[in-house]
Amino acid sequence: MPVSEAFAKLCVNEKPPAESAVAVKSLVFKPKTPKSATPVPIVVVALQSTTTPSALIANATSSKDPRLARDDLVKQAFQSESARAFILGDLANATSNFHLLIDHELGTVDGDTILQLNDSTYMKKSDMMKFLNNFEDSQKVVDFSQEVSKETATEGKKQQKKQQPSKAGTAAAAAAAALEDAKLIGITVDKALDFPGWYQQILTKGEMLDYYDVSGCYILRPPSYAIWENIQKWFDDKIKAIGVQNAYFPMFVSSRVLEKEKDHVEGFAPEVAWVTRAGSSELEEPIAIRPTSETVMYPYYAKWVQSYRDLPLKLNQWNSVVRWEFKHPQPFLRTREFLWQEGHTAHLTAKDAEEEVLQILDFYAGVYEELLAVPVVKGRKTEKEKFAGGDFTTTCEGYIPQTGRGIQGATSHHLGQNFSKMFNLSVENPLGSDHPKIFAYQNSWGLSTRVIGVMVMIHSDNKGLVIPPRVSQFQSVVIPVGITKKTSEEQRKHIHETARSVESRLKKVGIRAFGDYNDNYTPGWKFSQYELKGIPIRIELGPKDIEKNQVVVVRRNDSKKYVVSFDELEARIPEILEEMQGDLFKKAKELFDTHRVIVNEWSGFVPALNKKNVILAPWCGVMECEEDIKESSAKKDDGEEFEEDDKAPSMGAKSLCIPFDQPVLNEGQKCIKCERIAVNYCMFGRSY
């Protein structure tokens, strides 16, 4: 359904009583730009009672002097009749990029509250947020109450010009400015009230990523890329230990090769990006950018494998892939380009191949549980959900407590002989030439940067990121404290030298540590900054600590404090980091275990789903029944169906996996949805 039609469908048909509706304004601003540049309009959605200062709008969008837009810009950008007639539904008609600023105070309004968008348009708050999430790449939640008056800022600039402050005055002014800025630096959205807005802020303010000017593509900043590097190192060591080698294949695929395996390509066809031109010339044959590499690699496997002695062939590549066609990009979870590893192996026997599939799945579970402190359920995908062209797919499934949705973590596929027959990857039978040749048994398996998004969603809080110590770019920050105006230069130097010594000692035992020795910022500001960035522990060191030969250690996840003597630094700090790692996993596992429930009767299925649970239900194994479960669980009690986008989080419960760890299935147990006999318990849930 087009987004414009979706907006109309979400509107309330009958006008509610005036006293029950909350007024909301939608304003379009135009930033000041050079005459040669095209202005990017700024749309502000706020409570009618909220003041929206232009200075804060400029700050939130990194623009200059935004002013209310005139009719010509609004007509051009959103095809609206005029600026006065602009309504949120016009966002669906946008002809170019725009900024969307959402008032933080809207998060305090209950989801069922009716909002008045203009004289004749009304909508539930939850439905308005659902509509605005169509433009997630453009949106940002802003706390307009934090604005500093323009007059004060202007007067401050005048005073700076009039007098040259002393060195001490400069430091004090810098510290004061930093504390004032901290209001805007911190997270301004409650995780429980506006999860999408919180997720966006925590990634950008925590410096995990930045938005790129191509929709659905993101810049991985050093903290997030370091997490990916730590995962790479751990997983690379694991797969090399079982004989896998790294290689690299080109990112381009000819249409002829890509279309050779139709069943496989069909699942990716809408998402394939094509190169059709080189400069001003049309290419004779369009070239695809790989969505995955089976069809890229397997012709060469067939070329290189000349004898059964060449098997197994086990290659992995660390690369990026492009999958283009979807409407709801989400950083890390669903992006148009993403980093991953993809392993492709060929074996002489099905037994060897199937054993490797499960071994790799254990490695993937290790990435989540041992590195990221994220619990997962291992299982097998249904026939409907398995990898196109494969015999069977195994998976690690996670759970996002805030939304109650499952999320696919990583998959390991057994392809059988389907691809080897297609690409003629065959060898002579070891039993002799009088036996038929053998087509290789193949596997493919992949893990992507999605893991980072899952980790952030599960562990982080309203203070900022919470990053497990084993994958964090830095595991500890050393912060000198207790330095005041009365502290002599000699004392200050001694505190810093002692702090640097602590930092150095930690590095020597493999702790990823750094120190912040900038005296222009207060310790309190630094504490907030490193909590926002998710540094696992901070180590405080002041004059009194030095006298006692100790440091104070504070954990990021729960602010638990430890006093550690200098003599125990090398032994105790690693222990504290491991304790934190374990506590993060324990907390996440308790939540997942609590919200993974067994339901045997259909009458309890949707109520359990609506309590943010994933469900273990007896199932017959029939695909039509699986589809019926998803369709039926997507309906409201009044029979109205939720609108769904295939790539958006599903409202109906889809099959997540058939867990390897099965509850006891009683003899004669019926399927939860039909009258057939159940063959196993399947895990169902709303999902990403």
From Swiss-Prot:
<feature type="modified residue" description="Phosphoserine">
    <location>
        <position position="149"/>
    </location>
</feature>
<dbReference type="InterPro" id="IPR045864">
    <property type="entry name" value="aa-tRNA-synth_II/BPL/LPL"/>
</dbReference>
<dbReference type="GO" id="GO:0005737">
    <property type="term" value="C:cytoplasm"/>
</dbReference>
<dbReference type="GO" id="GO:0004827">
    <property type="term" value="F:proline-tRNA ligase activity"/>
</dbReference>
<dbReference type="InterPro" id="IPR002314">
    <property type="entry name" value="aa-tRNA-synt_IIb"/>
</dbReference>
<keyword id="KW-0067">ATP-binding</keyword>
<dbReference type="InterPro" id="IPR004154">
    <property type="entry name" value="Anticodon-bd"/>
</dbReference>
<feature type="modified residue" description="Phosphothreonine">
    <location>
        <position position="170"/>
    </location>
</feature>
<keyword id="KW-0436">Ligase</keyword>
<dbReference type="InterPro" id="IPR017449">
    <property type="entry name" value="Pro-tRNA_synth_II"/>
</dbReference>
<dbReference type="InterPro" id="IPR036754">
    <property type="entry name" value="YbaK/aa-tRNA-synt-asso_dom_sf"/>
</dbReference>
<dbReference type="InterPro" id="IPR016061">
    <property type="entry name" value="Pro-tRNA_ligase_II_C"/>
</dbReference>
<dbReference type="InterPro" id="IPR004499">
    <property type="entry name" value="Pro-tRNA-ligase_IIa_arc-type"/>
</dbReference>
<keyword id="KW-0030">Aminoacyl-tRNA synthetase</keyword>
<protein>
    <recommendedName>
        <fullName>Putative proline--tRNA ligase YHR020W</fullName>
        <ecNumber>6.1.1.15</ecNumber>
    </recommendedName>
</protein>
<dbReference type="Pfam" id="PF00587">
    <property type="entry name" value="tRNA-synt_2b"/>
</dbReference>
<dbReference type="Pfam" id="PF09180">
    <property type="entry name" value="ProRS-C_1"/>
</dbReference>
<keyword id="KW-0648">Protein biosynthesis</keyword>
<keyword id="KW-0597">Phosphoprotein</keyword>
<dbReference type="GO" id="GO:0005524">
    <property type="term" value="F:ATP binding"/>
</dbReference>
<dbReference type="GO" id="GO:0017101">
    <property type="term" value="C:aminoacyl-tRNA synthetase multienzyme complex"/>
</dbReference>
<dbReference type="InterPro" id="IPR002316">
    <property type="entry name" value="Pro-tRNA-ligase_IIa"/>
</dbReference>
<keyword id="KW-0547">Nucleotide-binding</keyword>
<feature type="region of interest" description="Disordered">
    <location>
        <begin position="631"/>
        <end position="650"/>
    </location>
</feature>
<dbReference type="GO" id="GO:0006433">
    <property type="term" value="P:prolyl-tRNA aminoacylation"/>
</dbReference>
<dbReference type="InterPro" id="IPR006195">
    <property type="entry name" value="aa-tRNA-synth_II"/>
</dbReference>
<dbReference type="GO" id="GO:0002161">
    <property type="term" value="F:aminoacyl-tRNA deacylase activity"/>
</dbReference>
<comment type="similarity">
    <text>Belongs to the class-II aminoacyl-tRNA synthetase family.</text>
</comment>
<dbReference type="InterPro" id="IPR033721">
    <property type="entry name" value="ProRS_core_arch_euk"/>
</dbReference>
<dbReference type="Pfam" id="PF03129">
    <property type="entry name" value="HGTP_anticodon"/>
</dbReference>
<feature type="modified residue" description="Phosphoserine">
    <location>
        <position position="655"/>
    </location>
</feature>
<dbReference type="InterPro" id="IPR036621">
    <property type="entry name" value="Anticodon-bd_dom_sf"/>
</dbReference>
